[in-house]
Every structure is written in C-alpha cells, then in structure tokens.
Curated annotation (Swiss-Prot):
This is Acetate kinase. Pathway: Metabolic intermediate biosynthesis; acetyl-CoA biosynthesis; acetyl-CoA from acetate: step 1/2. It holds the Pfam family Acetate_kinase. Its cofactor is Mg(2+); Mn(2+). It comes from Borrelia hermsii (strain HS1 / DAH). Belongs to the acetokinase family.
Amino acid sequence: MKILTLNTGSSSLKFTLYQHKNTQILASGTIEKIKTKKSIIRIKTQNDLLEKIDKHIKSHKEALKQLIKILTNKKLNIINNLNEIQGIGHRIVHGGPNFKNSVILNENILSELEKISALAPLHNPTAIKVIEITLKIFPNAKQVLCFDTSWHQTMNENAFLYATPYSWYKDYNIRKYGFHGLSYAYITKRVATILNKHKKDLNLIILHLGNGSSINAVKKGISYDTSMGLTPLEGLAMGTRSGDIDPAIIPLMSKVLNKTPRKIEEILNKESGMLGISLKSNDLRDIWEGVENNEYNSKLAVEIMAYRIKKYIGSYLAILEFNIDAIVFTAGIGVTDYGIRELSLKGFEKIGIEIDLQKNNLAREKNIESDISSEKSKTKILVIPTNEELTILEDTYNLITEHSRDLK
C-alpha cells in the first residue's frame, strides 16, 4: 500500500510518499514560502535524486498541483498514476477536546474540525483547505487525520485545567491541549525498543527542542503533562515565542505601546523568545556565534532558554516522583545542539542524571541516535531524531486496514 503523508504549515507543505510494506520512502520533500515569489520546491526520491525548483506558488492549491506533477513525473519514476496512492495521512495541529485519536475522514469529521478552527487560526483553516482539495484529487484514497494534540488527551484534569473559572472550560474548551504529540508518540515507541521495555512500563521526560519547543512528561507510556498549553505559546522560551509570561503583560503593553491585544499576542509569538532577547536571530547557531563574540544578549538568550528547560525538567522529575527511565532530546535543537543539552542538565548529576561531555559533544548529526549518559548515570540520557511522518504512516495504515476489515 502506498501512503502519502502531508504536513501543512501556514506557508509550507511537507510531503512523504511511502511504500508501507517496508516503510520505504519513494519520495519526500517540502514546498516552502507558499504565497511568495520566492517559493522553493525540494524533492528527494528513493534513488537519492535531488531536485530544487524555484517557482512562484500563490496558494496551497497550486502547491498540491505541483506536488501531483512531481509524483507523476516520468523522469523521476515515482508512481505511474495517482490511483496507486491508497491512503493519505494529514497532520493536523489542533484537534480540540474531542479528537482523542487519529480518525478516518468523513463529512461529520470535517464539520467538527471546522468548528474548532479558532483554536489554531494559523494552521487548521489551511489544513482544511488542503484536505478539501485532496478529496477531489484523490477520490478513491482513504484519508486519515492525525492530530498533534491527541497524544496529550491522557492528561488528568489537574494537569490540563487552568485555574480560571470552571465555566471557561465547560463552555469554551479553555484548557491545556499540548502539541508535538506525533513526535512524542514516535519517541516513546522508539525508546521502548531501545531499552527493551514495554511502553506501558516507561517513565520519560522528552524534550522536543526546535524553533517551537516543548517538554513532555510520560508516565507508564502515556502523556502525563506537557509545557505547551491552549496554544503553542505557553511553556519554554522558543525561537520567536516568549513561552510562559504573566498574562497581565498583554493589557499593560497594549496600553504602553498603543497596540491592540491581538498585536501584542503577535509580538509574543513572532518577535519574542530567542529573537527578542538576542536582538539578532531566532536561530541558535547565529546566537552561539554571538556568544563566542562575547555578545551580552546572545549569552543571555542561551541562558534563559537553558534555565527554562532546567525548570521544567525539575518539575517533571517531581511529578514523576523521581522515577524515570530516560531523558530524551529530539527535534532540530535537541538532536544537534550539544551546548543547550549540557547547560540544561548541569547540576542534575547530584541526583544521578549525568551527561558524558565527550559523548554529548560528538552527538551533533541530524539523523543519528546517541546515548550520551555517563557510566555513573542512573538515568539514560538519549538523543533520538524524531519521525512524525512515521507516526502518521502507521496510524493511517492501521485505520485503513481496520476500516477495510469492518466492511467485510
């Protein structure tokens, strides 16, 4: 069975075409900077044929048309026709309170998804447009929605509720949802294999560190708490997001700057975090260069990021009652930035969590798994590249095959 996974961003479209039988990647790539004159299409085929195409792509609809041309291009030899694709798995950022697992798409599901678009206004409406287009392009393929929030639906009320009026939760669904769930699901499954343990016996602290970052406490193989909240703005100091702040800052700065609350929220999302503190970049590689050049704000940005991470690790150790099997670093920064890993775990050796500095310094490659714990460490410290697409692939395949059995 050939399955296409689609990860729709507000201005991008990431795709992978799999042959499920052996999880072989037939083609993968990204279409970036959609809606601009500097759109870029990057493609990699199973023969490692690389293609880069510069093209003005005005919309996600046009991006999908370009994707179809790529997949059916005889020169690339990926597929002969679109009917070969039997399943499509969509990553959906926000599933709201009702989508606790991945689901096969139908009219009722699509209607329910439209109702919660306000919870993720930058991502869900665009994803819905892509779904509607793929329904027309692939009328015979089963489509599956995989939600980044579903993984965290196992959290208890005392973890996901805010201490706001209870009616806000009951009437308006105001609560912590958490994100990066597809990544956490993959990492948890992978750690179970690495440690040769049943997933239900695992207690983990997983750090998904990228331009958007979060931490997940996993207890008995399921999500117990996470740092992001109703939206991805809560939690750690990130590339451009502030993370945790006093909410009174919003009306205060709205008045001081004579800007609307929505504009202040935009600043907290797009002009804060590492970019806001460093005064130069949201990219930690640029910021580390600033540290080497003794730039005060670059040094401060790194310290703030590591300090926030350390606070969350400490609090999650407490709620897991100091009984954890591993601390896992994943995503772009988590896998490649040895400096952030070292700073974030400094001091934890006093409670048996000790990093091996030499192993840590060598763990910089994007696609390599590493054990960076010292021989003395009572807790494993692992670096594992994430694979959200593989989670989407497995969920899509499993739901389609279950659906086919039910019809027999």
